[in-house]
A protein has these predicted regions:
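Active-site mouth of glycoside hydrolases
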Residues: 1-189, 193-201
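Catalytic-core region of carbohydrate-active enzymes that cleave or remodel glycosidic bonds
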Residues: 45-52, 154-165, 181-265
Length: 265
């Protein structure tokens, strides 16, 4: 169908390496799921065969959240799980032991898959503003979260001989961008969402406004999650929305056309 890039999440339910002991195939912090690693090998091989690039998502909001798609209660760093040591989800971003676990995870990921031509880049966390325990959608303004992106992004760049792009993704839309995060030298581009929330007449203005907002940071901006509603719509509506976004994205200075959330279409 002409698609040449996709996001792949290393999620707890598929392709993740590190999760709570007792969940099938997982063995807690710093003990990786070799079955899922093998499966990701196959995914990357398949992507290479079809000339498809993968933006590999290392963490996602739910695993560090108590309120949005919450999985924190099962996180292996949570002291409520066997071997865990953290009390609150935001400690994930500031605790030195947690940072060391993330460095090891990044090192393994880069060593095992960094050679692959199909790897486009590494996304440190998807929808990072939905992490934590507060529902304001602005966790990414926390200085500890920004510092985590700087530190882990810098570490990945230091160990990556291939110079893959590094990013951290923000949910909602361009109005939620944090300049302090967007301007980090360790972030190569700024990925974000764009949902029109039941107002299809907003598709073209939303895409155009996203491009305008990205220009302020002098680096590429890319809509990596687009759709009418994250809760879906009819197939006909989805196809119309995708058509509008593809054309709009090609006519404004985005680094690529919006990436549709509903891959099944």
């Amino acid at each position: 169908n002409g698609e040449n890039i996709a996001e792949v999440w290393m999620s707890a339910w598929s392709l993740g390496l590190e999760w709570t002991e007792g969940v099938s195939g997982y063995h807690g912090a710093n003990d990786y799921h070799m079955g899922n690693a093998w499966e990701l090998d196959r995914v990357i091989d398949l992507a290479h065969t079809h000339r498809l690039y993968i933006n590999l998502v290392l963490n996602y909001h739910g695993r560090i959240s108590t309120w949005c798609d919450p999985e924190w209660h099962l996180h292996p760093y949570n002291k409520a799980t066997p071997g865990g040591w953290l009390t609150r989800p935001l400690e994930f971003f500031s605790d030195e032991r947690a940072m060391e676990m993330q460095r090891r995870f990044c090192r393994y990921t880069q060593a095992r898959w960094g050679w692959a031509p199909a790897i486009f880049g590494y996304e440190l966390c998807s929808e990072i503003n939905l992490t934590g325990h507060e529902t304001h959608h602005k966790t990414h303004f926390d200085p500890a979260v920004v510092a985590w992106c700087r530190t882990l992004g810098g570490y990945l760049k230091n160990i990556d001989a291939y110079g893959h792009l590094v990013s951290a993704h923000v949910s909602n839309d361009y109005t939620f961008l944090n300049p302090a995060l967007c301007n980090l030298a360790e972030m190569d581009f700024n990925p974000l969402d764009a949902y029109h929330h039941g107002q299809p007449e907003r598709i073209i203005p939303l895409v155009a406004a996203t491009a305008d907002a990205g220009a302020a940071f002098s680096k590429p901006i890319l809509i990596t999650e687009f759709g009418g509603s994250p809760m879906a719509a009819g197939r006909e509506h989805l196809l119309i929305e995708q058509h509008a976004a593809l054309w709009a994205g090609a006519c404004v200075p985005l680094s690529g056309v919006p990436m549709f959330w509903w891959w099944q279409v």
